[in-house]
Amino acid sequence: QSALTQPPSASGSLGQSVTISCTGTSSDVGGYNYVSWYQQHAGKAPKVIIYEVNKRPSGVPDRFSGSKSGNTASLTVSGLQAEDEADYYCSSYEGSDNFVFGTGTKVTVLGQPKANPTVTLFPPSSEELQANKATLVCLISDFYPGAVTVAWKADGSPVKAGVETTKPSKQSNNKYAASSYLSLTPEQWKSHRSYSCQVTHEGSTVEKTVAPTECS
């Protein structure tokens, strides 16, 4: 009972088609018309998109279709959309109430439209200041492609110490999100007129500023 073989990755441009193969043996894929396909977005549970080789559950668009020839089953996704970017797994019955699963294929959708980030800057909370800490949080969301650079400034001058920025992660809408944190002492926070988080994405810059005087 070894895993069914799938290509590790596949890609296609928006609107195009992509086909994923799932190769087994005459004891599983070739022997039964019980091949299913699952779609799994990052951090989410898998969802059945095809069962019994070529049947679609209600709610699954007809852009998804399945077929089988000999010991190989195939899933075709036509008219690719951004939300089709996910991992896809096949499975097949192999007798004696057993099922065997595929190795999985990561599908990348190319040519998605650029989306500029939404940036929100939060000052330290009063509770945190009372605990003798001060953290500024810069939330960056809804951007594509998934790369940004973040710079912090105090009164317009660059700040490098105490900065931590997360790696962008994919949101459920297929755009990306990241966070950047600036750790200060309450004295540092109160000794400047303003702090800024500057986010650069695809050559464009968004800057958000907070001032200690606005928050007691």
Swiss-Prot record:
Superkingdom to which the source organism belongs: Eukaryota
Keywords: Adaptive immunity, Cell membrane, Disulfide bond, Immunity, Immunoglobulin, Immunoglobulin domain, Membrane, Pyrrolidone carboxylic acid, Secreted
Residues in the signal sequence: none
PROSITE patterns attached to this UniProt entry: IG_LIKE, IG_MHC
GO cellular component: extracellular region; immunoglobulin complex; plasma membrane
S-S bridge residues: C22-C90, C138-C197
Ranges for region Variable (V) domain, involved in antigen recognition: 1-111
InterPro entries, per database record: Ig-like_dom, Ig-like_dom_sf, Ig-like_fold, Ig/MHC_CS, Ig_C1-set, Ig_sub, Ig_V-set, IgV_Light_Chain
PTM-bearing positions, type Pyrrolidone carboxylic acid: Q1
Record localization: Secreted; Cell membrane
Region (Constant (C) domain): 112-216
Residue stretches making up the Ig-like domain: 1-108, 117-211
One GO biological process term: adaptive immune response
Assembly, per entry: Immunoglobulins are composed of two identical heavy chains and two identical light chains; disulfide-linked.
Task of the protein: Immunoglobulins, also known as antibodies, are membrane-bound or secreted glycoproteins produced by B lymphocytes. In the recognition phase of humoral immunity, the membrane-bound immunoglobulins serve as receptors which, upon binding of a specific antigen, trigger the clonal expansion and differentiation of B lymphocytes into immunoglobulins-secreting plasma cells. Secreted immunoglobulins mediate the effector phase of humoral immunity, which results in the elimination of bound antigens.
Protein name: Immunoglobulin lambda-1 light chain
Organism annotation: Homo sapiens (Human)
